[in-house]
């Protein structure tokens, strides 16, 4: 008695189901294209998800939304010879590719399998096939940038927001971007409030050339002295 196992030659993982459907048409029967539906893991909203005392070690957790789609990916990965990570060519896309690879590795599904990272900037047959033909490694600098962004989001937002709610009733939240932006806006508003207008005049001369064209010029030197912005504080100084 023989047992025949169906083998998917190549598994391609993208972010969105719409892209998966289109790319599947371009690649044909030797490929199965599945969507991760965005990020598959995140930092749980609890203390200790990022540990600054342990080189900012981060604890990742699969959310309930992603479990269904991860099961489809893991089931397909078991039957695949090659796994192609084709998420978006940006910081977040690189992070998703890294998370998928790490997750499959933790599940011990990468043994004896080839895993590749491919990117394409448009969803056309030419761009997709060119990307498939030119795989590369996961860009660790982009992954590191994502981790720094996510760790700061957690450390600033998760830890400081509750303090704001306690100390400043009515406060919404703190954040990696919004808190800095609010600081800049506040400082600028203070500068505007403290601004005292100062009168100054500039000296311009118009010349007419032989053709009758008017040429406007700013006088920058008068009596061998450079004219500064506040050299003429009122009309009488000119």
Descriptions of predicted regions:
Residues 4-150, 164, 220, 225-236:
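Intrinsically disordered, low-complexity regulatory segments
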Residues 11-13, 84-86, 117, 176, ...:
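Structured core elements
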Residues 14-15, 35-37, 87, 156, ...:
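Flexible glycine-/small-residue-rich
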Residues 27, 79, 158, 197, ...:
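Short flexible coil/turn linkers enriched for glycine and charged/polar residues
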Residues 109-111, 157-166, 182, 210-225:
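Short acidic (Asp/Glu) and glycine-rich catalytic loops that position anionic groups and cofactors
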Residues 123-207:
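C-terminal or mid-to-C-terminal helical accessory/interaction module adjacent to the motor/catalytic core
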Residues 200-238:
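Compact Cys/His-rich, Zn2+-coordinating modules
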